Amino acid sequence: MPNKKTADPNEKLILGVEARSAVELIKHRHGPGVRFVFSDNNNNPEGNIYTIVRFVENVDHPEAHVEPHQHEFESLFIFKGSNPDMTGLEAEVMFDDKWYPISSPRAVRIPAGKVHTYRFVKGSGEYWNIVLTPGANYNRTVK
């Protein structure tokens, strides 16, 4: 009888990453730069963490691509500039109706139920968005 190889259940814990537009999300448009999805309901349906990173280069004016919204669960924004000390990216985060300037490196905690959005203002770097959500399904939590 041939030796039958069984699938290693741990392999599904190693997630593939792919570039995708934000248009798949409620209240989002394409947006600047390139967006990479690290964890969502497509590659991690048993998980509870949605994670993306967006790379932008040479931003020279404010550009919003996300409408103000809220989630049922907490999330975290991470702004990391392209310089060795992680500076080099300027953004703004809106809570309720007020904009707050962000200079990288910086993390911003978004409590559950807090109306928010963000926009890049100037520079180059990375934006990470980490959302705690059942089944890693971002759209399930947007209001």
Predicted segments — roles?
Residues 61-77, 87, 95:
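A short beta-loop-beta micro-motif enriched in histidine and acidic residues
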Residues 1-66:
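A short, N-terminal "cap"/entry segment at the start of jelly-roll beta-barrel domains
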Residues 101-122:
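Conserved metal-binding segment of the jelly-roll/cupin
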Residues 1-21, 121-143:
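Double-stranded beta-helix
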Residues 77-104, 140-143:
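A short beta-strand-loop-beta hairpin characteristic of the jelly-roll/cupin
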Residues 83-85, 115-116, 136-137:
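Short Gly/Pro-enriched loop/turn and capping motifs at secondary-structure junctions
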Residues 37, 50-55, 75-80, 92, ...:
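Ordered hydrophobic segments in well-structured contexts
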Residues 81, 96-98, 113, 121, ...:
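Short, loop-centered acidic/histidine patches that primarily coordinate divalent metals
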